[in-house]
Amino acid sequence: MGGSLRVAVLGAPGVGKTAIIRQFLFGDYPERHRPTDSPCLYRPAVLLDGAVYDLSIRDGDVAGPGSSPRSLEEWPDPKDWSLQDTDAFVLVYDICSPDSFDYVKALRQRIAENRPAGAPEAPILVVGNKRDRQRLRFGPRRALATLVRRGWRCGYLECSAKYNWHVLRLFRELLRCALVRTRPAHPTLRLQGALHPARCSLM
């Protein structure tokens, strides 16, 4: 058994957080958007280079029942997010929405500012979703990737949840970073996907 990892998938409403998770776990895509009204916790097992890891993937806001926050001002105190022991973060934005990118920018800053003293730094992967709408994007990929990687010191990747493009790569990169930080001598990891459908429970 390889151990366990806690992952939080965050971002503005409508950017495709749930769609990304469902493509990774179940290989399906909801054609009709349904807002995530309550946080959802998925518990899949994944195989990485022959070792099985139990994942805990949190989808949606962490403020409790109710609609997802539409701005950072609507979030509760970061110290109450129950995310301080999270091993890795996925911050999702819509490549056609500059507002969703600003949301991720502010969210990343809050996560950094409120990490408990002495706690290991949790890797953050910024993900630009809806790559299938490339012609409508608000900014060039190269410039955004450079800003995130060099300025924010976070990982950067773009995907299309609709067409399942780079979704597996997204989680492979995230888990690789999380495990390398906890196990510096760990060899290159190869994510082979979820072993079985995840259990989902509303919190």
From Swiss-Prot:
InterPro entries, A to Z: P-loop_NTPase, Ras-like_GTPase_Reg, Small_GTPase
Superkingdom, natural source: Eukaryota
Propeptide: 201-203
Chain ranges for the short sequence motif Effector region as given in the UniProt record: 33-42
Gene Ontology annotations for the cellular component aspect, listed alphabetically: nucleolus; plasma membrane
Lipid attachment residues per UniProt (S-farnesyl cysteine): 200
Entry's family note: Belongs to the small GTPase superfamily. Ras family.
UniProt name for this protein: Ras-like protein family member 10A
